[in-house]
Amino acid sequence: MAKTSMKAREAKRAQLVAKFAEKRAALKAIIANPASSDEDRWDAVLKLQALPRDSSASRQRNRCNQTGRPHGFLRKFGLSRIKLREATMRGEVPGLRKASW
């Protein structure tokens, strides 16, 4: 199990990403636009740097919904490989069963 503080930190990051997504996208569009002037581009870079560090989507980490485990995460199910296997063995995942050949 991951520490509660780690789960809370990830939840806070997700909240910040959602809050600043539009502003961050607008600033990145100005920076990427070749028609924008150098001054506008530079102002956009400075404003982007002034945003909270955790508002960047790349700082988020996928974690298991049940345990908070950061490694072995399967996006399709939102679970780590360990919890997915346990749920599959109990028959709680529709259409998924242990391989046999």
UniProtKB/Swiss-Prot annotation:
Keyword Amino-acid biosynthesis belongs to the record: no
Gene3D superfamilies: 1.10.287.1480
GO biological process: one example: translation
Keywords on record: Ribonucleoprotein, Ribosomal protein, RNA-binding, rRNA-binding
Gene Ontology CC annotations of this record: cytoplasm; small ribosomal subunit
GO MF term (any one): structural constituent of ribosome
Keyword Zinc: no
Superkingdom of origin organism: Bacteria
Family from the record: Belongs to the universal ribosomal protein uS14 family.
NCBIfam families per the UniProt record, alphabetical: PRK08881.1
Subunit structure: Part of the 30S ribosomal subunit. Contacts proteins S3 and S10.
Protein role: Binds 16S rRNA, required for the assembly of 30S particles and may also be responsible for determining the conformation of the 16S rRNA at the A site.
Name listed for the protein in its UniProt record: Small ribosomal subunit protein uS14
